Amino acid sequence: MDSSSSSSSAAARRRINAIHSHLVTSSRSSPLLRSNPTAGEFCLDNGYSVVLPEKLNTGSWNVYRSAKSPFKLVSRFPDHPDIATLHDNFEHAVHDFRDYKYLGTRVRVDGTVGDYKWMTYGEAGTARTALGSGLVHHGIPMGSSVGIYFINRPEWLIVDHACSSYSYVSVPLYDTLGPDAVKFIVNHATVQAIFCVAETLNSLLSCLSEMPSVRLVVVVGGLIESLPSLPSSSGVKVVSYSVLLNQGRSNPQRFFPPKPDDVATICYTSGTTGTPKGVVLTHANLIANVAGSSFSVKFFSSDVYISYLPLAHIYERANQILTVYFGVAVGFYQGDNMKLLDDLAALRPTVFSSVPRLYNRIYAGIINAVKTSGGLKERLFNAAYNAKKQALLNGKSASPIWDRLVFNKIKDRLGGRVRFMTSGASPLSPEVMEFLKVCFGGRVTEGYGMTETSCVISGMDEGDNLTGHVGSPNPACEVKLVDVPEMNYTSADQPHPRGEICVRGPIIFTGYYKDEIQTKEVIDEDGWLHTGDIGLWLPGGRLKIIDRKKNIFKLAQGEYIAPEKIENVYAKCKFVGQCFIYGDSFNSSLVAVVSVDPDVLKSWAASEGIKGGDLRELCNNPRVKAAVLSDMDTVGREAQLRGFEFAKAVTLVLEPFTLENGLLTPTFKIKRPQAKEYFAEAITNMYKELGASDPSANRGL
C-alpha cells in the first residue's frame, strides 16, 4: 500500500470517527476543529458555531454546526433521551410537575374577565385523557386529522395533547381564516373532527356541506342550549366541549401512543403567494427542534409565560412544547390584542415571546414619551440609558439606581417581572434589541426559523452582546450557504461568505402534504432544505439574514430587487407605519405604498404650518409626499441602498395593512399578489407620474 492510499484510509477513519462520535466535552480536545478563513473567521474560545473540516463537507460549501454539539446533531433532550414524542413530553410533565400551575385564563364561562384561574399539569392530563377518549368514543379512527379552529385558550393545548396521546394528527387553523380557506384546508387534510368556538362556528357551518370528511364538530365555550342541531342525513354531529369531556370520562380509553416518525401535525403555511401548503411535521421533528433549542433557552418551573401569539404558528407551538418540558405556567390573554397590556399587568410573566411589530411599538411609544417630556426627564433618561448601555457592553452590572429612577416604570408595562424576551418571525432591528436589553434588564434573544424546520434554525447564544444577527445554528441542524450567482452572493465573498441558507438535520419536515413536486423544489437529493433566505457568516460563526431570494424580481434593465430588504429599511422612517415596495420587468424604477403613522403626520404638518384639511387630504398633498419621499431617501442612503433600490414615487394611505383587509398573513408578512391588486390603481398612477416627468424613466431599454 502506497503512502497516498494509507493517508486516504486514515482520513476516512477520522471522518467516520468524527461523524459517529458523541458530543465532545471540549472543542479544544479535538484536532478536527480548525479555523477556516474562507468560511468566516472564528476562534474556539468564543466561537458559537464551528466549520466542519473540509473532508467532512457535503458539496462545495462550508457546513456549520453549533459549537455545543459539533459532531452529533441533537435529536433528543440530553437529560431525558426517553422523550421521543409529544406524548412522552407531556407525560413527563404530568409526572414531574403534577401539582404545578399549568394553564391559566382570566375569561369566565359567562365571558367576564377576572383574576387568573389555573389548571395544574395533573388536571390538564386528566382532561387530555377524557378528550381523547371522547374522540375514540365517536369513532374517529387513529391517524385521523383533527382541526383546531380558534384562538389561544387552555382548550387549544388540551386538544393538541389529546391528539398526541391518541395518535391523531392536529391541523391548526388560524381563527382569521375565511370559509374558502377553511374549506380548502379541511378537505386537503381530510379532517374528520374539528374543534371551534362560537365565533368560528358560523364560518364553519356555512361550508360544512362542502367538507365531506367532517364527522364531528366540537364547540368550545358558549352555552350548550345554543348549539345548532344538524339533520341526521348530514352525517355530522355537533357537540359541546364539555359534553365530549363527559362522554370520554364515561368511556375511558387507553392511550394509543405514536411512534417518533408518526405525523404529529400538518401546519398550513399562511402563504404570501397562492394556495396554502401543508407542512408535515413528525413527533421526531418537533422534539429534535425543541431539544436543540433547550441548549441555550432555559426555562424553570417557577417561570410564567403569556400565550398570545397564534398557536397555529410554529413559533408559538414550539414555545409551548418547551414550556411543557420545563413545567412552566402558561397564562392566556383575553383574546384581544388591545387588552394585552392589561393581561400582562395581571399575569406578571417572567418570559415574554413576541414579534418585532410589538417590540417596535413599545420602543416607539417610550421614545416618543421621552422626547415629549423634555427638560430634566429627557436628560435623566438619556443619562440612565447611556450608563446602563455602557455597563452591558463591558459585561458589568449597571448601578441599581438607574432602575429605581427610570427603568422600573418601563418594566411595569410588561408586568415588572420579565427576565427573558424572545423575538422571531421577522428581523428585529439592532436599535430595538439594544433598547429592550437596556430598559428591561433581562436577556433578549432573537431567533430564525420556519415551519418547514419545525421552528428554530438558529438563535442568539447567551452572553453574546453583538446585535444584528440571528445567532448560531440550532444544535439539531447544520447550515451551509449556497452561491446565488444571479444575485452576486457567493461563498468567496469578502469579508464574509454569502449565499442562500440551506439546512439539514432531524428538524427538517417530511414534505408538503400531497405535493411531491413542491417538496422536491425545496429539499434536494442530499437532504438540504433550501430556505430562500440569503445570509452571511459573521465572526464567531453567527448567522445574519441579509436578503430574500423567493420574492426577488427584475426591473426593466435587469437589476434584481429584494423588496423585503428595502421595506425593512424604509420601516425606520418616522412617517412610515408600513411599506409595500413594487416593481416589475416593464419599469426601471420602484414605487412605494406607505401606510403612514397618523400621529407623526399630524405633528409634522403642524410644525410646517400646513393648516386645515383632514389626514386624507394631507396624504394627497404634494408637499407631504415630497417630505416623506425625502425622509425615505435619507434612510435609504444611511442603509447604503443601491441607486435602483430607491423608491422614485410614493402613495400615502391611512388604512393600515391588516389581516382583515387581506394584505397581511397571520405572521404580519405582506401578501404581495393581493397588495399588487389592492393598490393597482395607485401603482398605475405612480408610473404615469414618473413617465410624465421623465419619459425614459419607466420603459425598458
From Swiss-Prot:
GO terms for molecular function: ATP binding; long-chain fatty acid-CoA ligase activity. Pathway: Lipid metabolism; fatty acid metabolism. InterPro entries: AMP-binding_CS, AMP-dep_synth/lig_dom, ANL_N_sf, LC-FACS_euk. Its EC number is 6.2.1.3. Expressed in roots, stems, leaves flowers and germinating seedling. Preferentially expressed in seeds and senescent leaves. One of its GO terms (biological process) is fatty acid metabolic process. Disruption phenotype: Seedlings of the lacs6 and lacs7 double mutant were arrested in postgerminative growth due to inability to mobilize fatty acids for beta-oxidation, a necessary process to pursue the development. The keyword Phosphoprotein does not apply. Belongs to the ATP-dependent AMP-binding enzyme family. This is Long chain acyl-CoA synthetase 6, peroxisomal. It comes from Arabidopsis thaliana (Mouse-ear cress). The lineage of its organism: Eukaryota, Viridiplantae, Streptophyta, Embryophyta, Tracheophyta. The gene is LACS6.
